[in-house]
Amino acid sequence: EYSPDGKYVLFSTEVKTGEQLTDKYPAYPKANAVLTDDLMYRHWNSYEDGLSSQVFYIPYSEGKVLGKAVNIMEGSEFESPTMPFGDGEQLAWAPYNKSIYYITKQKTGMAYAVSTNTDIFHYDLITKSTTNITEGMMGYENSPAFSPDGSKLAWLSMKRDGYEADKNDLIVLDLKSGKKQNITEFWDETLAAFKWSGNGKSIYFEAGKEATYQLFELTLTDQVADLKQGKHIRQITGGDHEITGMQVTAHGLLASRNDFNRAAELYLYNQKTGEGQKMTAVNDEIYAKIRMPKIEKRWIQTSDGKKMLTWVLLPPDFDRNKKYPALLYAQGGPQSAVSPFYSYRWNLQLMASKGYVVIAPNRRGLPTFG
């Protein structure tokens, strides 16, 4: 990532931070075994190997890097971006080129394995000093992003340590006053991602709503009454689909949209009306040759008298006078709802196309229902 003035490049790369097998057994340099005597020994499909991703910056001019890269985490054994899902959104240049903000979890071994407590650290390029700006916030901090004028820093935050499915709130820090404000504290849903508006007076974000994923606008306010009543939050889009990967443009909100029957395509949404214009048609020629399942959205009464949203996918050419085998898709959660997803692994459309009635309930405890 380039600094705002284009004079530096910010990047991460792996450095040796722990003992490797060849350190213990130098006589066997070609050995590819994994020796484990402590947690954390694996992140999903990636084993702990004595290497950690750390953050560097290097001077840059006219297409060339100049001098030597500086590791702003030099001497530590911590990582940034964090495993397993951390990416470039965990790093941010301050608007005036003098500071870098990054996410890390300053724990190792067993303590690292059972904790979700990441923090945002501020590195000063002039003094080479590092400060934890979220000290005392015990949950998962993620995705720091500056307002367009550089006066505020926003990020996603979970409250509780060790609870990876906690509610994601949006925190805004006024860099001049030092005041932190949780501006979604009283909103009864969890955020997925966000972007600042062009004028910095509002924030657009993605969030779930009754097993769909939509775009919202949040107007910045100090009025406690508005915060408690949710008056500062407005839902922009609707419909039975997932909207993700949103970017703010001069012409509207550009985002990816998919549903059970259609893979992701790009849409441009009007921020005021929520109307979406389809910008790509990558798969339309293929869809024209496919008999699609019919999707039904049903609210089923549960045994305790509540309502449960359930998706039913009927096979192509479904005949209600015939009997069909059924498949029950029972997703566990609690990280995500059973939304109208298009998966290359669990593709419910493909299952229905083979002659099954697919039943996909949003069981109790899944998000997007408050």
List PLM regions with ranges.
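Short, solvent-exposed loop/turn segments that connect beta-strands within catalytic domains
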Residues: 62-66, 164, 222-229, 272-274, ...
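Predominantly a core beta-strand signature of beta-propeller blades
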Residues: 68-70, 128-132, 178-182, 224-225, ...
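Predominantly five- to eight-bladed beta-propeller fold
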Residues: 11-64, 69-75, 103-121, 264-266, ...
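Conserved beta-propeller blade repeats
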Residues: 1-9, 41-49, 75-103, 110, ...
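Short glycine/acidic-enriched loop and turn motifs that connect beta-strands
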Residues: 16-19, 107-110, 159-163, 209-212, ...
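Short loop/turn segments that connect beta-strands within beta-propeller blades
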Residues: 60-64, 124-128, 174-178, 219-223, ...
